[in-house]
Amino acid sequence: METESRAQSTNQTQTDSLSPSPNPVSPVPLNNPTSGPRYGTVIPNRIFVGGIDFKTNENDLRKFFSQYGSVKEVKIVNDRAGVSKGYGFITFETQEDAQKILQEAEKLNYKDKKLNIGPAIRKQQVGIPRSSLMPAAGTMYLTTSTGYPYTYHNGVAYFHTPEVTSVPPSWPSRSISSSPVMVAQPVYQQPAYHYQAPAQCLPGQWQWGVPQSPASSAPFLYLQPSEVIYQPVEIAQDGGCVPPPLSLMETSVPEPYSDHGVQAAYHQVYASSAIAMPAPMMQPEPIKVRSLF
């Protein structure tokens, strides 16, 4: 009977030693500051202080915490307008002073107001996805006035260190495909001359033509794409001349272009604002001579 009672008491002792702490307040145990926290590294001689009144300045906090140790630095976080956000950081000269404050955090009241005191933790992200380090709801992402980002969650401040991310692999340069590449080139105006195909006439017929002068350099219509159909001259049965018709077929709406220069273009037709029309052909009437004999 004594052996069984001793065995039961031994099992009960082991179970109690393996059971978790009933009141886990912070991911960093207060009595063991050297243990690695879940979200970063503890700053041994620095504490986080929340619940600071907006009227409280850094000198007031320095005087208050100097009662518990040698204060090295006091920093209250302000917004861009210079208004206090209600929390800050106290840095002590030694680690023992900071741990003394953490152990008495539940008893500290400043101006009849309870302060939210916890360890200051520097957050580290080395090759770990950001999503895996996101704390639960109620987390505030903050930045000190000097530009250091940190996270405030459950009364604990987590400092952010610069991320060390892997350099993305350099992709091999792709070769240019053999498919045709269209490169838009500027099109310049070219002096346009009206050309009239020579008409074929029968012998003995007279023909007058209006001399054609080069077109003016005024802005003209740039037709793209266009096509000019040339038809040969036809000879009328009555012995006259029929001028060759000049037809212009447009397949798109012309758009104005006013640049000057000379540029060779393929599959493009340049026409002036007035399309050249063939000169009229005049045929003289035969002269009738009366014979007096």
Swiss-Prot record:
Entry annotated with the keyword RNA-binding? yes
Region named Disordered: 1-39
Localization of this protein: Cytoplasm
Q: Mind listing the UniProt keywords for this protein, alphabetically?
A: Cytoplasm, Developmental protein, Differentiation, Phosphoprotein, RNA-binding, Spermatogenesis, Translation regulation
Which GO terms label this protein's molecular function in UniProt? identical protein binding; RNA binding; translation activator activity
The Gene Ontology biological process terms listed for this entry are: cell differentiation; meiotic cell cycle; positive regulation of translational initiation; spermatogenesis
Q: Where is the composition biased (Polar residues)?
A: 1-16
Q: Identify the InterPro entries for this entry.
A: DAZ_dom, Nucleotide-bd_a/b_plait_sf, RBD_domain_sf, RRM_dom
One Pfam family, please name it: RRM_1
Every DAZ domain range = 172-196
Query: Where is it made, tissue-wise?
Result: Testis specific. Not expressed in early embryos, primoridal germ cells and spermatogonial cells. First expressed in the cytoplasm of spermatocytes and then persists through meiosis.
Question: What region holds the RRM domain?
Answer: 45-122
**Entry GO CC:** cytoplasm
Q: Does the keyword Transport apply?
A: no
The subunit field of the Swiss-Prot or TrEMBL record says:
Interacts with DAZ1 and DAZL.
Q: Which family does it belong to?
A: Belongs to the RRM DAZ family.
PANTHER family reported for this sequence: BOULE-RELATED (PTHR11176), PROTEIN BOULE-LIKE (PTHR11176:SF10)
Function noted in UniProt: Probable RNA-binding protein, which may be required during spermatogenesis. May act by binding to the 3'-UTR of mRNAs and regulating their translation.
Q: What is this protein called?
A: Protein boule-like
Species assigned in the record: Mus musculus (Mouse)
